[in-house]
């Protein structure tokens, strides 16, 4: 699935310190920095995406130029893998710490309760989403789940993809948590950059 048209970031990517690793512009950040950045720029980040990068995705990008473009095409690629943050520290970025996708999601869900942030979960099995529908409100009382959807594992038709976009738009999320597995999820975010409501992660 190719990206449709061009996308201009509404937040300056130069605000994000980066440590290039095998060509991937990995954000040289820690969790407090990321949460502060998210809170300050969330509205302007709608339609953009964050890659959650580890050794596997970084090596895959090094070997596949099209995937490298995907990894570097969002607002940032956060260092989910410990070796990435360790490499950054050795290269002169002492502030660079491992920031995992699940930790970021849970931090945003907790922080977002008081702020009224709305979350949409896209991907995974229906069984997993059903469990999350029960677990998340218990763990984060007051959380706003805008929607959940488990798409087919096969490639979607244009009609199905458009229906997904309309479903997400109607839900008006602040965050779109994409769980399709790498590299599919990153390619999906790149293809839908600028077409969805919410920050994709």
Predicted features along the sequence, with ranges:
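N-terminal nucleotide/polyanion-binding subdomain common to many enzyme families
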Residues: 2-98, 102-103
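Short amphipathic alpha-helical segments
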Residues: 63-64, 89-91, 133-134, 188-191
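Short glycine-rich anion-binding loops that position phosphate/pyrophosphate groups of nucleotides
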Residues: 54-58, 180-185
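Catalytic alpha/beta core domains of metabolic enzymes, predominantly
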Residues: 181-201
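Conserved beta-alpha
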Residues: 11, 85-171
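Conserved acidic residues
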Residues: 75, 146, 174, 199
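Proline-aspartate-enriched helix->loop->beta-strand connector
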Residues: 168-182, 198
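A short helix->loop->beta-strand "cap" motif at the edges of active sites that frequently abuts
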Residues: 47, 117, 196-199
């Amino acid at each position: 699935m190719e990206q449709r048209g061009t996308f201009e970031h509404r937040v300056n990517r130069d605000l994000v310190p980066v440590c290039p690793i095998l060509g991937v512009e990995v954000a040289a950040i820690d969790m407090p920095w990321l949460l502060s950045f998210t809170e300050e720029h969330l509205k302007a980040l709608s339609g953009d995406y964050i890659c959650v990068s580890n050794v596997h995705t970084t090596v895959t990008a090094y070997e596949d130029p099209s995937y490298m473009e995907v990894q570097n095409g969002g607002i940032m690629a956060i260092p989910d893998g410990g070796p990435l943050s360790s490499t950054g520290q050795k290269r002169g970025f002492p502030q660079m710490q491992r920031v995992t996708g699940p930790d970021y999601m849970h931090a945003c869900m907790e922080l977002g309760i008081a702020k009224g942030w709305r979350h949409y979960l896209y991907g995974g099995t229906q069984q997993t989403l059903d469990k999350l529908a029960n677990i998340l409100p218990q763990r984060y009382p007051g959380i706003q789940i805008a929607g959940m959807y488990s798409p087919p594992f096969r490639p979607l038709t244009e009609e199905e993809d458009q229906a997904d976009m309309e479903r997400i738009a109607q839900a008006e999320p602040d965050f779109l948590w994409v769980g399709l597995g790498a590299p599919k999820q990153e390619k999906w975010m790149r293809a839908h950059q600028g077409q969805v409501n919410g920050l994709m992660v």
